[in-house]
């Protein structure tokens, strides 16, 4: 049986941290920012962690 391929789209969107959690970028922070307030755009540029219910599924895609 051949090796499992990692999901290239998931690899571009998610990163595994050293402690084993999965990091992601927030949506809606790349363009059309002129009508969003400054506090919101600042928060959108910060990365966050993936929810624990989806973590196992995403790890399987990026570490396959």
Swiss-Prot record:
GO terms for biological process: translation. Gene3D superfamilies: 4.10.410.60. GO terms for molecular function: structural constituent of ribosome. Residues 17-41 are annotated as: Disordered. GO terms for cellular component: cytosolic large ribosomal subunit. Signal peptide: none annotated. Pfam families: Ribosomal_L35p (PF01632). The keyword Lipid metabolism does not apply. The keyword Ribonucleoprotein applies. It comes from the Bacteria. Keywords: Ribonucleoprotein, Ribosomal protein. Residues 25-35 have a biased composition (Basic and acidic residues). HAMAP family: Ribosomal_bL35. Belongs to the bacterial ribosomal protein bL35 family. This is Large ribosomal subunit protein bL35. It comes from Chlorobaculum parvum (strain DSM 263 / NCIMB 8327).
């Amino acid at each position: 049986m051949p090796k499992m391929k990692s999901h290239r789209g998931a690899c571009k969107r998610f990163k595994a941290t050293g402690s084993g959690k999965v990091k992601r970028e927030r949506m809606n922070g790349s363009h059309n920012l002129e009508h969003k307030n400054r506090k919101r755009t600042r928060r959108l540029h910060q990365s966050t962690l993936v929810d624990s219910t989806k973590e196992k599924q995403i790890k399987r895609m990026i570490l396959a």
